[in-house]
Every structure is written in structure tokens, then in C-alpha cells.
Amino acid sequence: MNNSEQLIALKESETAFLKYFNKADYELVDFSVVEKLDWKQLNHEDLQQMGERNFWQHEHQIYALRNDFTDQLLRYYSMYPTAATKVAYTGLIIRNNEAAVQVGLENYAPSLANVQQSLKLFIQFIQQQLRDNVHFVVLGHYQLLDALLDKSLQTPDILSMIEERNLSGLVTYLSTEHPIVQILKENTQQQLNVLEHYIPNDHPALVELKIWERWLHTQGYKDIHLDITAQPPRSYYTGLFIQCHFAENESRVLTGGYYKGSIEGFGLGLTL
């Protein structure tokens, strides 16, 4: 496929996404790639993200190029509440001077049934329009870390070693028998079963993970992995997250996660 054909295919995929979810009764939204920001309203996490963002000042006003749709919509709807419970979008995101096209959904009534229906529809779009399918799924939950590791041990060094799966370093700092070390020693496909030995069966994170595992099995997905190493990109990501890796185009990953800040929601996004 030459450059012109790739461009046409990309634009057709964007349009097809909007048509598909418009038909499914999602509200379509179109926000400017240029965000107007107020320094006084930016929190510590906002400021930390400025390192990857392109921003400038004009007449005492700060502007920045969009780097995250969920964050932009959350910021906007916090100021201007919407009656919409599910929205669909397409457009550019720019991170570290690299531009990419993203399509995605935000579910502002994030019941289990609503979120799973959104994921099901998204995968159907991938199958029908992108001619691809989900090869394997990664599940995780941002409450797991607190369940497995005492707050006093959640130092930058230890968190970094967990993220890097540095077992030798973790053994030094935590011990061989520590739950995190024991879980990470297992194959990621087995870690959800192993997790049950280290946290109570009624722990909300484990309950939610098992519900999702069972649902994914009913959808025909058996290759399911647990990730206990991921740390939330923003503090408002407090619950379950999912990554659906593609069978044909291995560089594509449908990602999603629950968040609760000034707005509660569950977002799903795919970079084309």
C-alpha cells in the first residue's frame, strides 16, 4: 500500500468509526486539537505532563496541543457538564512532537454492562472495518498495588523495580517470599490464579478481575494475562484497565480503563 492509499485508508477508518458509533447511539464529539489552559487550574500532574506537550503563550493565555482525549474531555465536561452518557471521537493526539490519529469512546455511565457492551462494539468495529481481531488480552487493576504492598514500601525505587519486573532487585528490598515477587515469578497467564493466594477472595479488585475474566471467556478470549506492574498514568485512574492486543497488526493495542476524578468514566482508545 503506497502513501496515498494509506492516507485514504486512515481517513476511511476514522469516518467509518464515527458512522458505526453514531448508529449505535453514541454522541459524536469534535474538539479542537489546540487546548486553552489556565495555569491557575493546572494541578501537579498536569504540569508533569507538560514535558511531553507542545505549548505556548499568547497574550497571557497558555495554549497546548492535545496529548490525551480522555484528559481533554474530562477537563471540558468538568467545566461544562454534559447529559451524554457515551461519546465517540476521532482526531489527532501529539506527544513528544509525534502526531497520531486516535479513535475512542468515553462511557460516563460506567456500569459493567455498559462498559462491556462498548468493548464488544469496539471489537466488532475492529473485525469488520480493520479486518483484524484480538489475539490476547491483558487485565490489571490499579488497586492491586495497595493490596499487595504496604504504603511505606511504595518508594520510587521499589515502584520502578516493579514496573521493570526487576526480580533480583525486588528480592533484595522485599524478600523472596513477598507476594509481589511470588506473583511476578509466574507466567502472566497464571498470575490471576496465583493472586488469589495473596489477597482476600472478596477484595473488590480481585472480584472485578474475575468477573472480567469470565466475561472474556464467554466472548471466546482464552489467552488472558494479568499485569500487576502497571502504575496509573494519572491519579484519577483508580480501577480496572484492559489492553486488547491485535492478531495481525501487532503494533495496535485497544486500551481502556476506569477513572474517577471530577467525572466518573471508562475510556477506550485505539491509535490507528
Curated annotation (Swiss-Prot):
Tell me the Gene3D superfamilies matching this sequence. Bira Bifunctional Protein, Domain 2
The UniProt entry's GO biological process terms, in alphabetical order, are: L-histidine biosynthetic process
Identify the main location: cytoplasm
Q: Where are the transmembrane segments?
A: none
Protein location: Cytoplasm
Its pathway is: Amino-acid biosynthesis; L-histidine biosynthesis; L-histidine from 5-phospho-alpha-D-ribose 1-diphosphate: step 1/9
Q: A Pfam family for this UniProt protein?
A: tRNA-synt_His
What GO molecular function annotation could you give as one example from this UniProt entry? catalytic activity, acting on a protein
Q: Other remarks on record?
A: This function is generally fulfilled by the C-terminal part of HisG, which is missing in some bacteria such as this one.
Entry similarity comment: Belongs to the class-II aminoacyl-tRNA synthetase family. HisZ subfamily.
Q: Which HAMAP family does the protein's record reference?
A: HisZ (MF_00125)
Q: What does this protein do?
A: Required for the first step of histidine biosynthesis. May allow the feedback regulation of ATP phosphoribosyltransferase activity by histidine.
UniProt xrefs under NCBIfam families: PRK12294.1
The name on file for this protein is ATP phosphoribosyltransferase regulatory subunit
Organism listed in the record: Staphylococcus aureus (strain JH1)
